């Protein structure tokens, strides 16, 4: 059905008379009491119908004459229909001409009103390509002191330009803009983090905000206005990515561990083999051992121990780091059992020298302990059973050449390997000699400290070496050294001799010069 027949067939008689441009009939209806702003089913008033009608016959009048008559009879130009359009919008959309638009503006039509599609009369005037009407609208805006910026963008499928009105914004290029029907939402905005300020690559020209759906044909232009919110800047040519990445991105835990190991190797380059040997010996002799003092007469040995502790702490290097260096220098090899017949020279020298030093300290403490004459003079004579036990113990302590040779062979045949840090050997201080007590050494005393006539080389007996213990030592597992009790078993049944002023001045001088 034709639009004219549709309009004329609906609504009241006043709307039908205005649609047919019958001025005389319209006058009669208004004088007869018809309401001039009465609307039809779509919300259109007689003034809107007068602006959009195209009906022409021999009895019709011009649009301007009909609009002028309706405005003179108090028609409201700012009433909106159900789609939000006013009479001014209909006049611009249907190309009613600059004369009709001027009449509406003079009657108080509002240029700032928008329909439900957010289009104003200016947008419809530009989309209809009516230059004269647009000039009238712009002149009206300037007369009211308003500056309007309108940007014509792409064309509709029918060939008409789509227009978006921007207020208080600088214009942008036509090719890079969007259709007015679709506005950018916050979800369509890409927030990009800025690159490092020290970077001088072309990627620093990107802004912090970009739009996802605005990549049109104009995205390859060289010029871009930074004030436009809808134009995505042209991307710089792809090149090598920046090396200034955050350290937590390119540094996994494995890489951090490798860097730490590399720095440890650099710190350990200046250490000589002699220093490394001394560190391992100190770590073996001084790691977590308990020291018990029974006399307070040793002056030199205390200073020696203090110097040893200071030397171990001044290097700021733990036994674990030494093991880490040796582990890395071997190429991360796995733990291998070392049989008795294999003798690596370096590790054997370390282990043998450590045991020799322990034996020397044991002998030194035994000799010094036997030099105390006050103990031998003040002791009660032992009973017959105790005397027999003491004689037996002295026999055990007296070394024989065969036992000494066997102990030397055992020291040479013990396989090398990194000892555990947790060998809880107990250092017992008796006199000025500090030596570890061991279950493997059958050396026992009575509770009241008898004098000992001990040879300088006590035997080391009951030491059995097998491949299993060697493998445990070579793998660095926890092997606890067996220890004898500090006090003998007979201590509970006997009283300890309390010493009072057991040293003379000459003996103290001898001990200091020892």
Swiss-Prot record:
The cellular location(s) given in this protein's UniProt record come to: Cytoplasm; Nucleus
Please name the PROSITE patterns in this protein's record.
ANK_REP_REGION, ANK_REPEAT
Q: Which UniProt keywords apply?
A: ANK repeat, Cytoplasm, Nucleus, Phosphoprotein, Repeat
One cellular component term (GO) for this entry is: nucleus
Any one Pfam family here would be Ank_4
The entry assigns this protein to a family as follows: Belongs to the ANKRD34 family.
The protein depicted here goes by the name Ankyrin repeat domain-containing protein 34B
Q: Which residues carry this modification: Phosphothreonine?
A: 272
Sites of Phosphoserine modification: 263, 296
Organism annotation:
Homo sapiens (Human)
Q: Which InterPro entries match?
A: AN34A/B/C, Ankyrin_rpt, Ankyrin_rpt-contain_sf
Gene name tied to this protein: ANKRD34B
ANK repeat coordinates:
9-38, 42-79, 83-113, 117-146
Q: Which SUPFAM superfamilies match?
A: Ankyrin repeat
* Residue runs in coiled coils: none
From the UniProt entry, list the residue stretches annotated as the region Disordered. Answer: 220-249
Give the chief site where it resides.
cytoplasm
Provide the record's note on post-translational modification.
Answer: Phosphorylated.
């Amino acid at each position: 059905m034709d639009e004219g027949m549709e309009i004329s067939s609906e609504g009241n008689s006043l709307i039908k008379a205005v649609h047919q441009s019958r001025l005389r009939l319209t006058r009669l209806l208004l004088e007869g009491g018809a309401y001039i702003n009465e609307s039809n089913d779509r919300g259109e008033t007689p003034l809107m119908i007068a602006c959009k009608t195209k009906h022409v016959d021999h009895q019709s009048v011009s649009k301007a004459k009909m609009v002028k008559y309706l405005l003179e009879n108090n028609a409201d130009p700012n009433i909106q229909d159900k789609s939000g359009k006013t009479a001014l919008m209909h006049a611009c959309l249907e190309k009613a001409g600059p004369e009709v638009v001027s009449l509406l503006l003079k009657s108080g039509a509002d240029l700032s009103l928008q329909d439900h599609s957010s289009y104003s009369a200016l947008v419809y005037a530009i989309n209809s390509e009516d230059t004269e009407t647009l000039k009238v609208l712009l002149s009206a805006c300037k007369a009211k002191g308003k500056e309007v910026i309108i940007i014509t963008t792409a064309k509709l499928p029918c060939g008409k330009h789509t227009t978006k009105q921007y207020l208080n914004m600088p214009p942008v290029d036509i090719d890079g803009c969007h259709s007015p029907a679709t506005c950018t939402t916050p979800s369509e905005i890409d927030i990009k983090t800025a690159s490092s300020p020290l970077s001088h690559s072309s990627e620093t020209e990107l802004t912090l905000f970009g739009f996802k759906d605005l990549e049109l044909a104009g995205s390859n232009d060289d010029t871009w206005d930074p004030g436009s919110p809808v134009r995505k800047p042209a991307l710089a040519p792809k090149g090598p990515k920046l090396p200034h990445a955050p350290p937590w991105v390119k540094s996994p835990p494995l890489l951090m561990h490798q860097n730490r190991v590399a720095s440890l190797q650099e710190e350990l380059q200046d250490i000589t083999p002699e220093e490394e040997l001394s560190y391992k010996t100190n770590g073996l002799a001084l790691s977590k051992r308990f020291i018990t003092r029974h006399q307070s007469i040793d002056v030199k040995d205390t200073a020696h121990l203090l110097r040893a502790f200071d030397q171990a702490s001044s290097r700021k290097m733990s036994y674990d780091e030494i093991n880490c260096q040796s582990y890395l220098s071997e190429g991360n090899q796995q733990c291998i059992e070392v049989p008795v017949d294999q003798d690596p020279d370096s590790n054997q020298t370390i282990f043998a020298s450590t045991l020799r030093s322990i034996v020397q300290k044991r002998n030194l403490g035994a000799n010094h302990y036997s030099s105390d004459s006050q103990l031998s003079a003040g002791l009660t004579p032992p009973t017959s059973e105790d005397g027999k036990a003491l004689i037996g113990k002295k026999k055990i302590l007296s070394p024989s050449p065969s036992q000494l040779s066997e102990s030397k062979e055992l020291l040479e045949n013990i396989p090398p390997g990194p000892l555990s840090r947790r060998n809880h050997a107990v250092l017992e201080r008796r006199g000025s000699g500090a030596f570890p007590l061991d279950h493997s050494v059958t050396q026992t005393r009575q509770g009241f400290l008898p004098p000992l006539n001990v040879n300088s080389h006590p035997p080391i007996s009951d030491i059995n070496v097998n491949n299993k213990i060697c493998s445990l030592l070579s793998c660095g597992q926890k092997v606890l050294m067996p220890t004898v009790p500090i006090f003998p078993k007979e201590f509970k049944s006997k009283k300890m001799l309390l010493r009072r002023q057991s040293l003379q001045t000459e003996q103290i001088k001898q001990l200091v010069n020892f």
